[in-house]
UniProtKB/Swiss-Prot annotation:
Enzyme Commission numbers on file: 3.4.11.5
InterPro entries (alphabetical): AB_hydrolase_1, AB_hydrolase_fold, AB_hydrolase_sf, Peptidase_S33, Pro_imino_pep
SUPFAM superfamilies the record matches: alpha/beta-Hydrolases (SSF53474)
Gene Ontology cellular-component annotations: membrane
Gene Ontology biological process: proteolysis
Positions of transmembrane segments: none
PANTHER family xrefs: HYDROLASE, PUTATIVE (AFU_ORTHOLOGUE AFUA_2G14860)-RELATED (PTHR43798:SF33), MONOACYLGLYCEROL LIPASE (PTHR43798)
Protein name: Proline iminopeptidase
Length: 299
């Protein structure tokens, strides 16, 4: 456990190291906001065989970490500060520190890369756009129109009544939105680590930043926008988009073009969790990027 200093005291966060490579150390940031590391266990089937050292990490309040119940920390600045404290404790530096972030973790990774890039070797942003506004645009203008009209009417009716706790709402969103855009594997074949992560989500964190639904951000992230600052990311950066993602892959491609040393990986048959529904292509693309960066710095 790593002690994290906060304005309300010191609390412990959980990390776990897999592998041993002094030149390549990857810290994995989970999505949500509020999801634990569990669903990132997919990396265990790929990274160890390539000699890549990596770290699981549960943000304060999530998963195996302490749960102080301090909602004042549910913001971007506090999360970035926490990642820096974790980096220091793990003794990662610009010679070996690769930061991976999926979804919300990608937003956190970009913010960290701008503030602390002297500590960073490379950045991997998976399935995340550059603003809450862009997320909402794509969901409302493109994705919800792909849902059956009767299903969408019911979802919208429940939303209008703020009846998000209705079992019907979660059933319809899971069956018609999640199964299309979050993970395209049949629902009864979703991997155990993914189901486990869903069962352990830090709901207050999710509600504060995202809001009650994936069908649009109405929490504090709706005003978050890093678009104009992408050019400040100086380290090599890989951006990953997918054909069936809830995030617009064309926008993610644009993001990669704003970064001086950006690359784009497109998972044509994947969704928000391409790490599961287009796994070999996704994982091999990340491994290739890590090896490229490592080899270029060795020359």
């Amino acid at each position: 456990m790593i002690p994290i200093k906060t304005p309300k005291g010191v609390f412990n966060v959980w990390t776990k190291r897999i592998g041993n490579n002094p030149k390549v150390k990857v810290l994995l940031l989970a999505g949500g906001p509020g999801f634990p590391h569990d669903y990132l266990e997919a990396f265990e089937s790929y990274f160890p065989g390539e000699g890549i050292e990596f770290y699981y990490y549960d943000e304060l309040g999530n998963g195996n970490s302490d749960k102080p119940g301090d909602s004042s920390r549910y913001n971007v600045a506090s999360a970035v500060d926490e990642v820096e404290q974790v980096r220091q404790a793990l003794k990662l530096d610009s010679s070996n520190f690769y930061l991976f972030g999926h979804s919300w973790g990608g937003a956190l990774g970009m913010e960290y890369a701008i503030k602390y890039q002297n500590n960073l070797k490379a950045l991997i942003v998976s399935n995340m756009v550059a603003s809450g506004k862009e997320f909402n645009r794509y969901v409302q203008q493109v994705l919800v129109k792909q849902l059956p009209p009767a299903i969408l009417d019911t979802i919208n009716d429940l939303s209008a009544r703020n009846d998000y706790s209705n079992p019907k709402y979660s059933e319809l969103v899971t069956r018609h939105f999640y199964a299309r855009f979050i993970c395209r594997l049949p629902l009864d074949q979703w991997p155990e680590p993914l189901n486990r992560a869903f069962s352990k989500v830090n709901t207050p964190y999710y509600l504060t930043l995202q809001g009650p639904s994936e069908l649009g951000i109405i929490g504090s992230l709706q005003t978050w926008d890093i678009s104009a600052r992408l050019k400040e990311i100086a380290v090599p950066a890989l951006f990953i988009g997918a054909g069936y993602d809830e995030m617009d892959p064309e926008h993610i491609k644009w993001m990669s073009q704003q970064v001086p040393h950006g690359q784009f990986l497109y998972c044509a048959n994947g969704s928000h969790l391409s790490m599961y529904d287009q796994q070999p292509f996704y994982m091999n693309g990340i491994i290739r990027f890590i090896k490229e960066v490592n080899n270029s710095s060795a020359n």
